[in-house]
């Protein structure tokens, strides 16, 4: 009887612990100056902790064991503490890293596989690390020493799956974003251009990207993004009048703390517009506040600023203030669904090893008996959806597709409005929409308000894209263009400038408008311009290439024929004949005088035909005075004279 009563009391005790111990799960943790704030997904405060500290700054979240690690700058004995949230109003802070000097912690990161803490020291300009299992017996070790190069390590973040540590170097002369393997090898500066003063940094395991804050010159700041190897650098947003320090990421958004406005701000990870301004938003949603401070949700209208390449037209900004705080906001962490990454090929092995270590730790601290068997059954029933309960940490590890403190929420339940839901490889719900629907949750009907001005919306059977059948006098993809208004504008211009080109189809519209306003409207000369709508296939872009092709073919054919003629034409015979000049001069002319008759040649003069100027005797020094004297023909006839006096025929 006593044994049964003991078992019953034990079961009741455990049940109360399960039901009260973790009543509401937090999604974000924020360090203020003197406390840590826990808020849910709607940014409602669910708990506060660490009230005994006075100078909190950086923090990190071990999602595998539900522990917060944070820094206090004024504690005399320790610099880094751990906080285990055990209830709605209960927490336990423990000393983790002892203080060994005048440290100034800039950022903290935690590796759940090796249970190792990494932190940057702004004063010593080094990055340290220590295992929480051996920190009581071993001194922290140096992973990276930037003191010799005058570097300043600020933010640190761990790629848990890729086993690398990332940090920002805020050296004013040579700022960088760097990484190193967790074993201390392979240091590499992955970003060293177009960067001013980088601050906080975070690794997005799902998107396999890094995000960091860059404190730009003047009053501006930027949030940047890049692949894990430093490629594909993107500007997520650029704004002013903020003093951001640290940031966190979730599946869709980025969050950062701002000391100037004492707020937490958010922005989409994939912005619709790259450059934003903090302008007044049309949203009427009340911004959550802490301890009575009112929230406006946006800057004043006077803060709209047209500078450089930024937007000059006020519009609804994707930059959103999430919560107003009474103290200076410093560090921030977010729940990212660590165990949901077990579907990722790179992360699955790491997560399996972490779960294996937790299972071994749980088995080593248990003694099986009747009470334990009853507790096992109760704990198995506590975690729903196939989740596993860890009594030492007092939380459930959910399988992919489930979330909540008891894994009670199926992420696919009612997620897709008009479609089928499946859990993606990254552990997130994904919708496959029915024809005619789109959106992340298939909540958008493609034809809803798609066609304007009475247009009829139709869906393509193959692509599923929406198109519009527009009524008369309307056109455009969504029937957004009023043909009457457009033609009226052109015909008004035509009234003042006769060279104005009026679009096709405006003749009848302008003619109708001219009946009421003939002094303002001119009617186009041509009623139909079919050639503008359907150009002749034998003109323009078709005829010109065809003509060029024909000309090239004829040119090639001519070259080919000329080559054949040169190849097969018989060679011309080599002519070498001699023209002989007589030795005696004429004696039968009574007009011969020493002045008119040349002296007799002492010997025979001859010329070779092939040396003549193209069979032309006019330019040769040898001549026949008798034949040339009475010849009045031109040089073309010299060939006949030359041939006439040959010793024999040419051929």
Swiss-Prot record:
Residue stretches of each LDL-receptor class B repeat: 115-162, 163-207, 208-253
Keywords tagged on the record: Cell membrane, Differentiation, Disulfide bond, EGF-like domain, Glycoprotein, Membrane, Oogenesis, Repeat, Signal, Spermatogenesis, Transmembrane, Transmembrane helix
Disulfide bonds: 383-396, 398-407, 412-421, 416-431, 447-457, 451-468, 470-479
Subcellular location: Cell membrane
Name listed for the protein in its UniProt record: Protein cueball
Functional description taken from the UniProt entry: Has a role in spermatogenesis and oogenesis.
Cross-referenced CDD domains: EGF_CA (cd00054)
Database matches in InterPro entries: 6-blade_b-propeller_TolB-like, Cueball_EGF_LRP_Nidogen, EGF-like_dom, LDLR_classB_rpt
């Amino acid at each position: 009887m006593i044994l049964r009563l003991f078992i019953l009391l034990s079961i009741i005790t455990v049940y109360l612990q399960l039901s009260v111990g973790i009543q509401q799960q937090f999604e974000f943790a924020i360090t203020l100056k003197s406390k840590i704030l826990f808020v849910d997904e709607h940014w409602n405060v669910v708990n506060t902790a660490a009230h005994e500290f006075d100078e909190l700054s950086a923090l990190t979240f071990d999602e595998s064991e539900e522990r917060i690690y944070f820094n206090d700058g004024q504690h005399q004995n320790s610099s880094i503490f751990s906080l285990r949230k055990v209830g709605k109003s209960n927490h336990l802070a423990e000393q983790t890293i002892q203080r060994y000097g005048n440290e100034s912690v800039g950022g903290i990161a935690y590796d759940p596989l090796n249970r190792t803490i990494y932190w940057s020291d702004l004063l010593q300009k080094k990055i340290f690390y220590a295992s929480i299992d051996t920190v009581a017996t071993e001194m922290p070790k140096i992973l990276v020493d930037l003191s010799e190069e005058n570097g300043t390590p600020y933010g640190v973040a761990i790629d848990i799956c890729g086993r690398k540590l990332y940090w920002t170097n805020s050296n004013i002369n040579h700022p960088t974003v760097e990484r190193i393997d967790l074993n201390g090898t392979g240091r590499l500066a992955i970003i060293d251009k177009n960067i001013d003063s980088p601050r906080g940094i975070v690794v997005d395991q799902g998107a396999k990207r890094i995000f960091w804050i860059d404190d730009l010159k003047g009053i501006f700041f930027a949030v940047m993004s890049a692949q894990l190897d430093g490629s594909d650098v993107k500007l997520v947003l650029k704004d002013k009048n903020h003093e951001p320090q640290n940031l966190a990421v979730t599946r869709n958004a980025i969050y950062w703390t701002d000391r100037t406005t004492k707020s937490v701000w958010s922005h989409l990870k994939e912005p619709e517009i790259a450059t934003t301004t903090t302008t007044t938003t049309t949203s009427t949603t009340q911004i959550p506040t802490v301890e009575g401070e009112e929230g406006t949700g946006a800057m004043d209208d006077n803060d709209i600023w047209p500078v450089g390449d930024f937007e000059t037209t006020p519009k609804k900004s994707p930059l959103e203030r999430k919560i107003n705080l009474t103290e200076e906001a410093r560090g921030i962490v977010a729940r990212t669904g660590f165990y949901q990454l077990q579907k990722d090929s790179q992360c699955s092995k790491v997560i399996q090893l972490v779960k294996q270590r937790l299972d071994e730790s749980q088995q080593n601290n248990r003694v099986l008996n009747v009470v334990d068997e009853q507790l096992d059954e109760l704990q198995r029933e506590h975690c729903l959806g196939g989740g596993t309960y860890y009594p030492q940490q007092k939380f459930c590890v959910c399988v992919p597709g489930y979330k909540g403190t008891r894994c009670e929420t199926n992420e696919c339940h009612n997620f897709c409005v008009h479609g089928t839901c499946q859990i993606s490889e990254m552990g997130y719900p994904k919708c496959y929409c029915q024809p005619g629907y789109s959106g992340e949750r298939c909540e958008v009907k493609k034809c809803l308000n798609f066609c304007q001005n009475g247009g009829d919306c139709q869906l393509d059977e193959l692509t599923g894209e929406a198109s519009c059948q527009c009524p008369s006098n309307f056109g455009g993809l969504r029937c957004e263009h009023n043909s009457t208004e457009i033609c009226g504008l052109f015909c008004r211009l035509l009234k003042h400038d006769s060279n104005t080109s009026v679009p096709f189809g405006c003749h009848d519209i302008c003619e109708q408008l001219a009946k009421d306003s003939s002094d303002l409207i001119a009617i186009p000369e041509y009623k139909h311009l079919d050639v503008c709508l359907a150009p002749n296939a034998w003109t323009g872009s078709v005829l010109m290439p065809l003509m060029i092709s024909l000309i090239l073919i004829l040119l090639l054919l001519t070259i080919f024929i000329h080559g054949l003629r040169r190849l097969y034409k018989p060679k011309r015979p080599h002519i070498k004949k001699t023209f002989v000049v007589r030795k005696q001069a004429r004696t039968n002319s009574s007009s011969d005088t020493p002045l008119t008759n040349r002296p007799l040649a002492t010997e025979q003069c001859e010329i070779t035909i092939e040396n003549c100027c193209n069979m032309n005797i006019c330019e040769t020094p040898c001549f026949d005075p008798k034949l040339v004297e009475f010849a009045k023909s031109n040089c073309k006839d010299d060939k006949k004279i030359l041939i006439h006096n040959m010793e024999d025929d040419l051929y």
